[in-house]
A protein has these predicted regions:
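Short, Lys/Glu-rich amphipathic helical modules
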Residues: 449-462, 639-641, 692-696, 840
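Hydrophobic, well-ordered secondary-structure elements that form the walls
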Residues: 454, 502, 744, 780, ...
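Extended, charged helical/alpha-beta scaffold domains that provide interaction surfaces
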Residues: 326-334, 340-348, 549-550, 557, ...
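Short Cys/His-rich zinc-binding micro-motifs
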Residues: 829-848, 852
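Active-site-adjacent structural elements in folded domains
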Residues: 110, 438, 824-826, 834
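Intrinsically disordered, compositionally biased charged tails
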Residues: 254-260, 472, 823-832, 850
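Conserved P-loop NTPase motor core
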Residues: 1-582, 631-632, 649, 653, ...
Length: 857
């Protein structure tokens, strides 16, 4: 604690003082609430809603509303909120993060702000990390809200759209972060307003907020469809990758070494940089790849795909590990969440990495996907009017919460003092010695019937320890991504006397570990960490599983100098010191230098990871601004707005653009190129050919005016072909939806390509981020122009007798199997396919060489 904190208290202490009087007020209302009958207590909800309509604010109602929920929870669940839980509730209502230690009843705390904010009728989302917790909390805590007359919903992965819509319409909805994000993206791909499932994003209370907003912030949510690319190249590159030899480099290639012209010697065919998770081919490796594929120069643009795929294959073999990063189950590669140890069904690595791993594991290589819609959690949760979070561990990441999400972290005191003892780390020279020591510690605790929870980072380690304990005859349970179905049950029994549980990372987070009498007497739950995680926060979460609500317990981490953290980020000098001391086998090393080296390494990685996430956000911010514009425009179409004015603006913009592009002010009118003007404008707006005679003696602005009038008149003639004006209005909406979706998806793809290639700009002494923004905006402008041109071309060429339904829009996205919206037959254009166009059947051949040939034949 620094001098200022000693004098004035920490930020949390100062904030808690401010709300003390509010908490006192809530507690003083207790007798008043106790005196009410169930019916009268329930009637309070109607009273509060009326008072809101009369002009009172949520803050005015807070003391009474909280006192109401407190009394309702006591009657329905037999649980009354402690004073510290009331404090937590106020912090959450204020849109901040409440750091509450494990076992302090975060789930019960959420009922307070959820009830208060639900009174506005705009919806409250309580966000959990998995379906099990969403369902459990909705059933358990939902009883309190239902008792008070509010509706409670839960959205689960298995639900159809109609069910989801009903659940989101409830006052309070329990839902996982993944379902929320994917529903948001899917809502921006629907073709009828009636198919939307979500309401506006109003207020979110995020449970395990650090897991959602920090750990998962590096993985964007992606909805994808299949692209037409063949998967053969992945298999071929996998064969080659197995033949290439890993080498070493004498230094790191950086911008500085390139400028200084420093020589770096490399051995082998490729170099792996484990710190930054990058693989590079050496000169020797490049020659081998060129010989293998019979190509002259791997760096040529036409060989970009080979280059990309061989790097992917090498990454799959050297940086992605089975039972650590992914598991293979039922002939499928499934990603394991590195922070929770849980399988992430439905998620696939993007950019072809997943296919490279499938080729490595000899399972069916599924076609590479094309991104249809994507968003990061950072940008998604920032869309809420107000958001709050709860977790046991957030203070170490306070800066990130404040900078990126605008939320400060308030540490809530525990209800009872923590009685857990956190022992110094036990460090050994090798992993082998470390695991022996872990088994000994488990054995010792097991003999006195003390329950033990062993935390591992990888599935591999959990299985190795399991084998070692079996040899010692110690009965135990293993909890990792392979057995996640039994997760909650295994965790719930982990605190019983004599039980030994091995779990990867924080599997089972959110399920309380309760002690029985026997385990209390034996010293409470003993936590053993087998490796330090990259983040101190994850280590603290593991420790926090023990010592809940003042229970006894102890925790200790067992490390070795061979652990990844020490190997990659620890100082080599330090390693050499201990090696030169000649530590005997199985002897524990204890040294202040060592403890501070571990702490430094973790801080270094945390800073590094924060940098990666901040960088990702800065790039995604560009996508986000563009996404907002497109989704807003799309929603206008969906809401059934009359698009006539928008179409007329497109017509005038297109004419302006064409005239500005072809006719220059600096050139004499005699030199204006009529042929070019006709070839630019007439494919979009089928005007009569423009001749020099037509515009004789006119200035450029007069030409614009004349062409605009002709184009508008032509469109009015098209309108007159339709018996009812609404037929054309609906047609405009259909075509706009289809074109926006098509162009936006292509744009997402182009942005991906731009993002991957932008790093090379750094070598050209230009700031990659600035370049990315400039190019992205140029691309966006081109996309908007393309949307306008394609929309007009289709509308001007539409024929009344063609009947095609709005469902054709869904074929663009390949999603939307929902049939809950109304279906009206409308007129629609059918795009002509020319002989040299790609064949619509998706074969990748030209139309004349595929289906076109069949028609001719």
């Amino acid at each position: 604690m620094n001098v200022i904190e000693k004098m004035f208290g920490t930020h949390s202490e100062r904030e808690l003082k401010r709300i003390k009087s509010t908490v006192d007020k809530i507690e003083s209302l207790r007798p008043q609430m106790q005196a009410l009958s169930d019916e009268e207590l329930r009637g309070k909800t109607r009273e509060y809603k009326n008072r809101l309509q009369e002009g009172e604010t949520l803050d005015d109602l807070l003391p009474e509303a909280f006192a109401t929920v407190r009394e309702a929870a006591k009657r329905v669940l037999g649980m009354e909120h402690y004073r510290v839980q009331l404090i937590g509730g106020i912090i959450l209502h204020q849109g901040r993060i409440a750091e509450m230690k494990t076992g302090e009843g975060k789930t019960l705390v959420s009922t307070l702000p959820a009830y208060l904010n639900a009174l506005e009728g705009k919806g409250v989302h309580i966000v959990t990390v998995n379906d099990y917790l969403a369902n459990r909390d909705a059933e358990w805590m939902g009883k309190v809200h239902e008792f008070l007359g509010l509706t409670v919903g839960v959205v689960l992965n298995s639900m159809k759209n109609d069910e989801r819509r009903a659940q989101y319409a409830c006052d309070i909805t329990y839902v996982t972060n993944n379902e929320l994000g994917f529903d948001y993206l899917r809502d921006n791909m629907v073709i009828y307003k009636e198919q939307l499932v979500q309401r506006d994003l109003n207020y979110a209370i995020i449970d395990e907020v650090d897991s959602v907003l920090i750990d998962e912030a590096r993985t964007p949510l992606i909805i994808s469809g299949q692209s037409g690319k063949s998967t053969k190249l992945y298999e071929v590159c996998d064969i080659l990758a197995r033949q290439l030899e890993r080498g070493e480099a004498s230094g790191e290639v950086t911008k500085m070494t390139a400028i200084m012209g420093e020589e770096i010697t490399e051995t082998g065919d490729f170099i792996v940089n484990e710190k930054d998770k990058i693989v590079n081919l050496t000169e020797q490796g490049v020659h081998k790849v060129e010989n293998f594929f019979h190509i002259e120069n791997l760096a040529d643009p036409e060989n970009l795909e080979i280059q990309h795929n061989i790097i992917l294959a090498l990454r799959a073999h050297n940086l992605m590990f089975r039972d650590q990063d992914y598991v293979v189950k039922d002939d499928e590669v499934l990603i394991v969440d590195e922070f929770t140890g849980r399988i992430m069904p439905g998620r696939r690595y993007s950019d072809g990495l997943h296919q490279a791993i499938e080729a490595k594991e000899h399972v069916k290589v599924r076609r590479e996907s094309k991104t249809l819609a994507t968003i990061t959690f950072q940008n998604f949760f920032n869309k809420y009017k107000k958001k709050a979070g709860m977790t046991g561990t957030a203070l170490t990441e306070e800066k990130e919460f404040r900078d990126i999400y605008g939320m400060d972290v308030i540490e809530i005191p525990t209800n009872k003092p923590i009685a857990r003892v956190d022992l110094e780390d036990a460090v050994y020279m090798t992993k082998k010695e470390k695991f022996r020591a872990v088994v000994e510690a488990v054995k010792e605790a097991h003999e006195k019937q003390q329950p033990v929870l062993v935390g591992t980072i990888t599935i591999e380690t959990s299985e190795l320890l399991s084998r070692m304990l079996k040899r010692e005859g110690i009965q135990h349970q293993v909890l990792n991504a392979k057995f996640h179905e039994m997760e909650a049950e295994i965790v719930a029994h982990a605190g019983e006397a004599g039980n030994v549980t091995i779990a990867t990372n924080m599997a089972g987070r959110g399920t309380g570990i309760k002690l029985d009498e026997g385990s209390r007497e034996a010293g409470g739950l003993k936590i053993i960490g087998t490796e330090r995680h990259e983040s101190r926060r994850i280590d603290n979460q593991l420790r926090g599983r023990s010592g809940r609500q003042g229970d006894p317990g102890e925790s200790r981490f067992y490390l070795s100098l061979e652990d990844d953290l020490m190997r990659l980020f620890g100082s080599e000098k330090l390693m050499n010191v201990f090696k030169s001391l000649g530590v005997a086998e199985n002897e524990q090393i204890e040294h202040k230098m060592l403890s501070s080296a571990i702490e430094k390494a973790q801080k270094k990685i945390e800073g590094n990871n924060y940098g990666i996430r901040k960088n990702l956000l800065e790039y995604d911010q560009v996508n986000n601004e563009q996404r907002e514009i497109i989704y807003k425009e799309r929603r206008r179409v969906l809401d059934g707005e009359n698009m006539r004015d928008a179409i007329y603006k497109m017509i005038t913009d297109t004419v302006e653009h064409a005239v500005d592009m072809v006719f220059s002010d600096d050139v004499d009118q005699e030199e204006w190129d009529m042929n070019e003007m006709n070839s630019v404008l007439r494919p979009i707006i089928p005007l009569q050919p423009i001749t020099r005679e037509d515009i004789k003696g006119m200035k450029k602005n007069q030409v614009k005016q004349k062409l605009k009038e002709e184009a508008v008149k032509l469109y009015e003639e098209k309108e007159a072909e339709f018996p009812e004006a609404e037929q054309l209005r609906e047609l405009e909406r259909v075509i706009l939806l289809k074109v926006i979706d098509q162009k936006w998806m292509d744009h997402i793809d182009d942005m991906d390509q731009l993002r991957q290639g932008i790093g090379l700009q750094a070598y050209g002494q230009r700031d990659p981020k600035v370049e990315y923004k400039l190019q992205a905006y140029e691309m966006f402008d081109s996309m908007i122009a393309a949307i306008q041109e394609t929309t007009l071309r289709l509308l001007y060429h539409v024929r009344l007798e063609q009947k095609v339904e709005r469902e054709q829009v869904a074929q663009v996205t390949g999603t939307n199997k929902d049939d809950s919206g109304p279906k009206k037959p409308v007129q629609k254009t059918e795009k002509k396919v020319y002989p040299n166009d790609p064949c619509p059947c998706g074969s990748g051949k030209k139309y004349k060489q595929c289906c076109g040939r069949k028609k001719i034949g």
